[in-house]
Amino acid sequence: MVNLNQSLGDLFKGIIPNVYVLGATIVSFLVLFLFITYFVYRPLKKYIKKRKDFLQNHIDLTIKSNVEAEKLEKKSQQKLLETKEFCIELKEKSQIEANKFLEDAKKTAIDNARQLINEGQKVLLEYENEIKSKYYMNVINVAVEICQKYLEKQDKNNKILQQSLIADLEKELRKRENSSKKKDNFGK
């Protein structure tokens, strides 16, 4: 048992610490704790906080950018719709104006064509009247010439006829005179 007591005594000797060793252990622990706290934990905590703030800042900026992007997208969609509506209105207006311009151009062309046709008809009528008057003048001139020739021929024929009638009448008168002279001569 002595052995047992001695071994238990040795055992408990190692369990009960020495005050100096315990104080040195506590001081070294405190120094190590302060060293780790000031040189490892705090810089690591600051770095983690900076990193967390940096990431949170980027997350906030990303969220803000996404919100702004959504707003800009909505604005651009709205502007796109407005632009499409404006284009549709512009297209309709331009079609209406083009149709109006075409109608006006058609009317103007038709009016000009009618005016040209009327002027052409007037020119044709004037030309036709001029040709008719020339034709009538030619016909009249030809008729006058024919009449003159006919009258000249008739005048010649009349003169010849008149001369032949005068000659026949003279012959007849001579015959009567001769026959009346013969009767007078017989009757004497």
UniProtKB/Swiss-Prot annotation:
Listed Pfam families: ATP-synt_B
UniProt-listed InterPro entries: ATP_synth_b/b'su_bac/chlpt, ATP_synthase_B_chain
Residues of the signal peptide: none
Superkingdom, taxonomy of origin: Bacteria
GO cellular component terms, A-Z: plasma membrane; proton-transporting ATP synthase complex
Protein family (similarity comment): Belongs to the ATPase B chain family.
Subunit field text: F-type ATPases have 2 components, F(1) - the catalytic core - and F(0) - the membrane proton channel. F(1) has five subunits: alpha(3), beta(3), gamma(1), delta(1), epsilon(1). F(0) has three main subunits: a(1), b(2) and c(10-14). The alpha and beta chains form an alternating ring which encloses part of the gamma chain. F(1) is attached to F(0) by a central stalk formed by the gamma and epsilon chains, while a peripheral stalk is formed by the delta and b chains.
Protein name per the record: ATP synthase subunit b
Species per Swiss-Prot/TrEMBL record: Mesomycoplasma hyopneumoniae (strain 7448) (Mycoplasma hyopneumoniae)
